């Protein structure tokens, strides 16, 4: 029951987030834990799912890696879903971070191989609807002939250098991020492996509930209780330093609850 009290308090905080914006970092962490649980509930044979190892959440199987960067945003003024803009700082910060990770893997040949064995996914509760950049990325992934349009768009973003004193650190950072991405020699290969997914708090919670009910055969009336327990157990394990699971180790941990 302690876990239930703890997690219920957090879920109440999430529902009140528009009134208490100072809870932003906490809710962002809870969003990450929820997504971590979802990936654990859908783990496949041979996979290792981790938290804060290769990315916010990571999935590894053999040489293959999936980098999952989570960005949770709070709309403090309205209850509507926020839209991710083409120059959203979290978007370009994430792309820049992935570029930095790849560059650490060695020479260009090693980086190229790393990209080929990796998928890079930005998970956000901001909507990607009508985002031209994402639309162009998806079009390019389907047809290489669309690369030129995407390349021009990225190049244009990198040209928007802020004025020295007027635009502030945020715009300067966006400029640096866009420039680093644009200057990266293998950006064409990288963007072929980039995906953006929209996951609202409610949708993520519902996906977890469905996995618990229909995949784990838990009666509907017990689904919320099981979710509370799993979230509490995972949070406790993370505090103790357990941040990676295989399908076997997660099954063992869940069976002990």
Q: Model-flagged regions — what are they?
A:
Residues 17-26, 30-97:
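Catalytic centers of nucleases
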Residues 1-25, 73-257:
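Acidic metal-coordinating catalytic centers involved in nucleic-acid phosphodiester chemistry
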């Amino acid at each position: 029951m302690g876990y239930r009290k703890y997690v219920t308090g957090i879920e109440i905080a999430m529902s009140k987030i528009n009134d208490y914006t100072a809870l932003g970092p906490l809710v962002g962490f809870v969003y990450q834990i929820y997504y971590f649980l979802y990936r654990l509930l859908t783990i496949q044979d041979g996979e290792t799912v981790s938290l804060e190892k290769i990315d916010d959440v990571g999935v590894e199987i053999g040489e293959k890696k999936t980098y999952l960067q989570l960005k949770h945003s709070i709309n403090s003024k309205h209850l509507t879903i926020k839209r991710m803009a083409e120059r959203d700082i979290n978007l370009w910060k994430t792309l820049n971070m992935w570029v930095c990770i790849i560059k650490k893997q060695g020479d260009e040949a090693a980086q190229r191989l790393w990209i080929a064995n990796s998928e890079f996914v930005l998970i956000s509760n901001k909507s990607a609807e009508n985002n031209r950049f994402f639309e162009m990325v998806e079009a390019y992934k389907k047809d290489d002939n669309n690369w030129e349009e995407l390349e021009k768009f990225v190049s244009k973003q990198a040209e928007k250098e802020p004025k020295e004193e007027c635009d502030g650190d945020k715009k300067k950072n966006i400029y640096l991020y866009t420039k680093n991405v644009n200057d990266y020699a293998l950006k064409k290969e990288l963007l072929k492996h980039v995906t953006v997914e929209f996951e609202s708090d409610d949708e993520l919670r519902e996906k977890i509930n469905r996995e618990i009910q229909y995949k784990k055969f838990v009666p509907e009336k017990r689904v919320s209780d099981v979710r509370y327990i799993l979230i509490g157990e995972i949070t406790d394990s993370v505090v103790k330093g357990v941040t990676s699971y295989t399908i076997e180790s997660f099954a063992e941990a869940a069976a002990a609850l």
